[in-house]
Amino acid sequence: MSAELIAVYKDEQIIDLESAKVLGLSDGIKALNGTEPIYFDDSPLALEVIRHSCAHLLAQSLKALYPDAKFFVGPVVEEGFYYDFKTASKISEEDLPKIEAKMKEFAKSKLAITKETLTREQALERFKGDELKHAVMSKISGDIFGVYKQGEFEDLCKGPHLPNTRFLNHFKLTKLAGAYLGGDENNEMLIRIYGIAFATKEGLKDYLFQIEEAKKRDHRKLGVELGLFSFDDEIGAGLPLWLPKGARLRKRIEDLLSQALLLRGYEPVKGPEILKSDVWKISGHYDNYKENMYFTTIDEQEYGIKPMNCVGHIKVYQSALHSYRDLPLRFYEYGVVHRHEKSGVLHGLLRVREFTQDDAHIFCSFEQIQSEVSAILDFTHKIMQAFDFSYEMELSTRPAKSIGDDEVWEKATNALKEALKEHRIDYKIDEGGGAFYGPKIDIKITDALRRKWQCGTIQVDMNLPERFKLAFTNERNHAEQPVMIHRAILGSFERFIAILSEHFGGNFPFFVAPTQIALIPINEEHHVFALKLKEELKKRDIFVEVLDKNDSLNKKVRLAEKQKIPMILVLGNEEVETEILSIRDREKQAQYKMPLKEFLNMVESKMQEVSF
């Protein structure tokens, strides 16, 4: 079965077997020229077809179990597929096995999946009395609609789909949630069931293993267990509280970045948290980003709480006159920003309403774009290497709606391409995916569970310098407009630390661990030595804790291990008298002894091992 053709890929579109017939091709899909065949396997294109059909299998099963069920949409998403629906019956996660069993029953029935096309009028009549399907049709332009049918079940859909339910053998329903109709909080709440599907048993098994690992590594769970951060309903959703250990971890990353930024010629700056709405109108945020912003009024003047740091940095640039000799100017700020996110999308530290960006803006001449971007790529590589992340780049080019002339866009895009080539970085191209004001490079990192995360970005901006009338004096003593490069490598500290926590499963490397060394005195008489050693380690900028509660030695060691502390030192008579320390080293997965002075030198050198 693995070699069976299920669809083809042509002109960036998947065409299934049924669609080929509807197109009037006498030999079906084989008559299509210039196509890429899609076979039944675990390749990305095949999985899109498989998961879409599995969403319909889910809907068919729900209809059989709950005859009053009505369906909205059931798309393929990054984590599999889902279907939004409503029913008068109460459904919980306990019902998922029953629904899954019904899906398997229909799959074994080997139902042919067929397609027909209807006019809008016919489709409205076919789904008469189904307000959810009418809502779907109201959002679709055009007068032709596809309807796919399997057994007694049919659904409005453009495809693509498998030719038969017999292909669907390896799937799993993963969770149940609520979802507002069309994502609008003002609409009714629907039920959403998520699922996953693969062509092979191995694909499903590997995925389910990853899901279990992800649950163990969930940064929200680790945040509580390790005392890193918390949320408080009295404060508000999406507003994290950094606890001492989490703040230590974050500070270490901030300090390492600051050292590197200063060495790379960046200047620290700081803008206000709130700015008059007048500047947000100049920047375009007021017209294009207002729904994501918070506002307040002071002395009858409207202010916007900043969702981005760029305007503040522009004002820093405008605080003095500049010549070509000053450029490039590199400003950085750990800028706190606020963005209005709907409550349904908030997710631990990954999606919050207040966060801090490792933000920088570079003001340079057009000719300096390539060298500046090249330096950022070098910086990015060192950071990702330090945290053991693999990563990929995506270059986004000019969209249909944009400002500036073709020549400027082409030069800016080529400068980014040349910088990527200079560093021998393979990259994908997202045609038309750039911002309206310039091309960009997105940095996507891959964690230990092979999940990809969008973090940093490098954006060339030719819009804001024009809006704010920025200028520098060039070599000919004429005013020239600088280019502005927006640059964030981590993205935000909140998001990066969430990803970092899950990547390492809380076992942070020594150089950023919130507690690097645990000292465990066996008895009260060893406590003085532990405190002296603690002071020596603190002088070397080591985060150290003395576990001196009145517990058994084994319990204290287990506590330190549970807290995922990289080094544990047990201090007894022998250690105090000889100053030869007993060390449990998580990284080396070993226990060994070392003289005190040698140990202090070792941890000092470990702190110097990592730099960006």
UniProtKB/Swiss-Prot annotation:
<dbReference type="InterPro" id="IPR002314">
    <property type="entry name" value="aa-tRNA-synt_IIb"/>
</dbReference>
<dbReference type="InterPro" id="IPR047246">
    <property type="entry name" value="ThrRS_anticodon"/>
</dbReference>
<dbReference type="Pfam" id="PF07973">
    <property type="entry name" value="tRNA_SAD"/>
</dbReference>
<keyword id="KW-0862">Zinc</keyword>
<dbReference type="GO" id="GO:0004829">
    <property type="term" value="F:threonine-tRNA ligase activity"/>
</dbReference>
<dbReference type="Pfam" id="PF03129">
    <property type="entry name" value="HGTP_anticodon"/>
</dbReference>
<keyword id="KW-0648">Protein biosynthesis</keyword>
<dbReference type="GO" id="GO:0046872">
    <property type="term" value="F:metal ion binding"/>
</dbReference>
<dbReference type="InterPro" id="IPR004154">
    <property type="entry name" value="Anticodon-bd"/>
</dbReference>
<dbReference type="GO" id="GO:0006435">
    <property type="term" value="P:threonyl-tRNA aminoacylation"/>
</dbReference>
<dbReference type="InterPro" id="IPR006195">
    <property type="entry name" value="aa-tRNA-synth_II"/>
</dbReference>
<dbReference type="GO" id="GO:0005829">
    <property type="term" value="C:cytosol"/>
</dbReference>
<keyword id="KW-0030">Aminoacyl-tRNA synthetase</keyword>
<dbReference type="GO" id="GO:0005524">
    <property type="term" value="F:ATP binding"/>
</dbReference>
<feature type="binding site">
    <location>
        <position position="361"/>
    </location>
    <ligand>
        <name>Zn(2+)</name>
    </ligand>
</feature>
<feature type="region of interest" description="Catalytic">
    <location>
        <begin position="218"/>
        <end position="509"/>
    </location>
</feature>
<dbReference type="InterPro" id="IPR036621">
    <property type="entry name" value="Anticodon-bd_dom_sf"/>
</dbReference>
<dbReference type="GO" id="GO:0000049">
    <property type="term" value="F:tRNA binding"/>
</dbReference>
<comment type="subunit">
    <text>Homodimer.</text>
</comment>
<feature type="binding site">
    <location>
        <position position="310"/>
    </location>
    <ligand>
        <name>Zn(2+)</name>
    </ligand>
</feature>
<feature type="binding site">
    <location>
        <position position="486"/>
    </location>
    <ligand>
        <name>Zn(2+)</name>
    </ligand>
</feature>
<keyword id="KW-0067">ATP-binding</keyword>
<keyword id="KW-0820">tRNA-binding</keyword>
<dbReference type="Pfam" id="PF00587">
    <property type="entry name" value="tRNA-synt_2b"/>
</dbReference>
<keyword id="KW-0963">Cytoplasm</keyword>
<comment type="similarity">
    <text>Belongs to the class-II aminoacyl-tRNA synthetase family.</text>
</comment>
<keyword id="KW-0694">RNA-binding</keyword>
<protein>
    <recommendedName>
        <fullName>Threonine--tRNA ligase</fullName>
        <ecNumber>6.1.1.3</ecNumber>
    </recommendedName>
</protein>
<dbReference type="InterPro" id="IPR045864">
    <property type="entry name" value="aa-tRNA-synth_II/BPL/LPL"/>
</dbReference>
<dbReference type="InterPro" id="IPR033728">
    <property type="entry name" value="ThrRS_core"/>
</dbReference>
<dbReference type="InterPro" id="IPR018163">
    <property type="entry name" value="Thr/Ala-tRNA-synth_IIc_edit"/>
</dbReference>
<keyword id="KW-0436">Ligase</keyword>
<keyword id="KW-0547">Nucleotide-binding</keyword>
<dbReference type="InterPro" id="IPR002320">
    <property type="entry name" value="Thr-tRNA-ligase_IIa"/>
</dbReference>
<comment type="function">
    <text>Catalyzes the attachment of threonine to tRNA(Thr) in a two-step reaction: L-threonine is first activated by ATP to form Thr-AMP and then transferred to the acceptor end of tRNA(Thr). Also edits incorrectly charged L-seryl-tRNA(Thr).</text>
</comment>
<dbReference type="InterPro" id="IPR012947">
    <property type="entry name" value="tRNA_SAD"/>
</dbReference>
<keyword id="KW-0479">Metal-binding</keyword>
